[in-house]
Amino acid sequence: MKHTHKLWIALILTGIVGGMVGIALTELMHFIQHTAYGYGTGGGHVSFREGVVQTSSERRILVLILCGVAVGFGWWSIKRFSRPQIEIKAALKQPLQGLPFLTTVSHALLQIITVGLGSPLGREVAPREMTAAFASVGGRRLGLDEDDTRLLLACASGAGLAAVYNVPLASTLFILEAMLGIWTQQAVAAALLTSVTATAVARIGLGDVQQYHPAHLDVNIPLLWFAAAIGPVLGATAVWFQRSAKKFPFLKRNDPKIIPLAIALFALIGIVSVWFPEILGNGKAGNQLTFGGMTDWRYSLEMTAVKWFVVLLALAAGAYGGLITPSMMLGSTIAFAAAAAWNTFFTAMSSESAAVIGAAAFLGVYLKMPLTAIVFILELTYAPAALLMPLCITMAGAVVTARKMGFE
């Protein structure tokens, strides 16, 4: 078989595997959520936020203690008994070394289990890593060279993201902007192929799901002025969040002391959730409130502070997980609260639109992928194209501010 044919066959298979991984992990997470919090058994759709709110305070705390046990003992066991873990970004530097399959799969499954139990981190790293683990095995068996294997692993990472969020174009940009940093014709074609394939396969099992249903996404001149004003605020806040998060965990994950620490910190998260149930899970609950205009500025600011706090607690406990949706929640709650202040003194504009552009700007700065973040939020919300202008204005101000603060 020709070398080029091997690569494109591997990319197609990776897209298929990415879609299947997305289905399996999403269903697993939903099963854990429904079982742990006791909702959704009577039929009909109930969101995680609604399910948690309906659950007693005692049950929330007990579930989070169980989550702490899984975090502490789970990652201690992986670090203690498994082969050394290799992150995808590190694997791209030495692609032929590959990813340790069992370690990576165990690591991904544990992320989904803990997020399902209420860990305040994101779920998106798990399908990315698991898909990349399968791609690593496939690339090795097909005898792909270093450059082709690097492309395959990067595309596998994007395929996992596309599958769980139903965002084929944003995942294509993620591969090019965040993973590879190149925009060759081959890379663009490969990224599109795997992302679209993974999304199509995932839709067979999960449906063509719109992740958020925002209300009143109106665009007017005041929103453009607000976008210019809020961008630097979001850029600076995203930098501060990154700097606060990188200090954790306190202990190495192979230190047995991390187990009681994780249990204690997650018990504290459970106690906090008695008053702020929206902080549990990856942050989608908070975004649903701000995007839908279902909260006020006071609670929005409180959610900002509390979500920031519990994310740091989870990281200090040694938990792994993504930060796409948590960072979106921080950006959306900040912008939603700021919009309320704006509307008090200036011509009114849509607070929901403000929340959407805030989520994108915070995400774009924090994960250093501004183009991906803009398209990501559009695909998640089905927002109108008219929102592109305020999105770009906010993102520009946020990115420039972050660079001025030394965040490259």
Predicted ranges, named:
Residues 1-408:
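Alpha-helical transmembrane segments and immediately membrane-proximal extracytoplasmic
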